Amino acid sequence: MFTENEQKILSIDIGGSNIKATVLNASGTFLDEYQKLPTPSPANPAKVLDVINQLAQKFSEFDKVAAGFPGFIKDGVIKTAPNLGTPAWANFDLTKALEELLHKPTLIVNDADLQGLAVVSGKGLELMITLGTGFGTALLRDGVLMPHLEIAHHPVTKNKDYDEYVGEFEFKRIGKKNWNKRMKRVIGILKVVFNYDRLYISGGSAKEINFKLDDNIVIADNRDGFKGGAKLWEQEHKMNAGKHEAVNSSEKI
């Protein structure tokens, strides 16, 4: 029987363009090269689950699953998924669906949350933004995920939210020079709103930033985002251990 430290985690990144997966150990070390397949169109639950199943079959074994999903999630249930372009995800229990598909315990978080868990230092207030098909955010204090507003769908101008202002479609439409002007403005806003100790930027468009960044801003390696799957399970184990300890303490009173 495996101990928690020996168990293998299938870490999945569900994106608007590609779905990627790899297997990690509990420390976040890659045990296999990551695999990817294009996100299907339309990206409804059945088609996305089929792609995930194809990816899972590329790995010989794993004991748990962690997945990052591009949308708002509550208790493992998808509430919105604007970057997958389909209302079919509303109130879809992705956790249950993956557990039934892969027959393994599963944790689901927003994709930016998974990235944030992977790369933050674990000290102070840290903000992660992802620049891919859309704009994602994760906020962590001392390495622990915090509830926060879904910034992507807040207005940044009179007519555009953050997704529409600096997302992949807009990058292609306005070009790199104008996109960088917008990103400079966005970072300035985030600095004032969050007063973060450190900002991390990842995603396919992060490499397109060409202006000088503050010393407390880091461009993260996209590949490192998978490691959030191990961190997610680590936090789950700590939370469960804390609950168990609290129950034992109350029984002794």
Regions found by a protein language model. Name each.
Residues F2-K47, K58, V144-R173:
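Short glycine-rich, Thr/Ser-proximal phosphate-binding strand/loop in the N-terminal lobe
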